């Protein structure tokens, strides 16, 4: 016997007794918990409504046939806007405390340098761009051509 959690989004004008009677008629093993949740403002309109009411139910089911029958009936009913079914028995990690994350701790290793090592690390080479001045020479042919035209 599997335990399922069902959340149904209903039309705000709908009576929740209809949802409860549908659950009781579909699941022969019984409904463990039936709870009406608060009205919730929706992120977008569904059937020209900006609010919806939610129903939470925990049911016991003997097989997939009951779940399939509930989905079929919920899809037929126009006032059931959305539904979500979660299998609590096969859900891994439910009702378990969260595992602490493993943290990697870096250890600081002090290096030993002597003055001899320090002098070897400094390079005596010139920098790659030793001369930053432009080596471009002005063309004198252009200026001479202008003088000849005058």
Swiss-Prot record:
Compositionally skewed regions (Basic and acidic residues) per UniProt: 113-129
Species of origin: Mycoplasmopsis pulmonis (strain UAB CTIP) (Mycoplasma pulmonis)
Which NCBIfam families does the UniProt entry name for this protein?
S6
Chain intervals for the UniProt region annotation (Disordered): 92-150
Q: Kindly indicate where the leader peptide sits in this chain.
A: none
Question: What family classification does the UniProt entry report for this protein?
Answer: Belongs to the bacterial ribosomal protein bS6 family.
Q: Where is the composition biased (Low complexity)?
A: 132-141
GO MF annotation list: rRNA binding; structural constituent of ribosome
Tell me which Gene3D superfamilies the record gives.
Answer: 3.30.70.60
Q: Which UniProt keywords apply?
A: Ribonucleoprotein, Ribosomal protein, RNA-binding, rRNA-binding
What is the role of the protein in this entry? Binds together with bS18 to 16S ribosomal RNA.
Q: Which residues form a coiled coil?
A: none
Give yes or no: UniProt keyword Ribonucleoprotein. Answer: yes
Basic residues compositional bias: what residue ranges?
Answer: 98-109
GO terms for biological process?
translation
A GO CC term attached to the entry? ribonucleoprotein complex
Q: What is this protein called?
A: Small ribosomal subunit protein bS6
InterPro entries noted in UniProt:
Ribosomal_bS6 (IPR000529), Ribosomal_bS6_sf (IPR035980), Ribosomal_S6_plastid/chlpt (IPR020814), Transl_elong_EF1B/ribsomal_bS6 (IPR014717)
Looking up Pfam families in the UniProt record yields: Ribosomal_S6
SUPFAM superfamilies attached to this UniProt entry: Ribosomal protein S6
């Amino acid at each position: 016997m599997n335990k399922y959690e069902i959340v149904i989004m209903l039309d705000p004008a709908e009576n929740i007794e209809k949802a409860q009677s549908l659950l009781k008629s579909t699941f022969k093993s019984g409904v463990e918990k039936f709870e009406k949740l608060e009205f919730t403002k929706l992120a977008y309109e569904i059937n020209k409504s900006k609010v919806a009411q939610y129903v939470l139910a925990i049911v016991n089911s003997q097989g997939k046939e009951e779940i399939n029958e509930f989905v079929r009936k919920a899809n037929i009913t126009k006032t059931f806007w959305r539904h979500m079914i979660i299998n609590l028995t096969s859900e891994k990690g439910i009702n378990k405390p969260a595992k602490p994350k493993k943290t990697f701790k870096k250890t600081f290793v002090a290096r030993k340098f002597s003055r001899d090592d320090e002098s070897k690390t400094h390079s005596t080479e010139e920098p790659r761009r030793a001369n930053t001045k432009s080596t471009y020479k002005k063309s004198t042919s252009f200026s001479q051509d202008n003088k000849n035209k005058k």
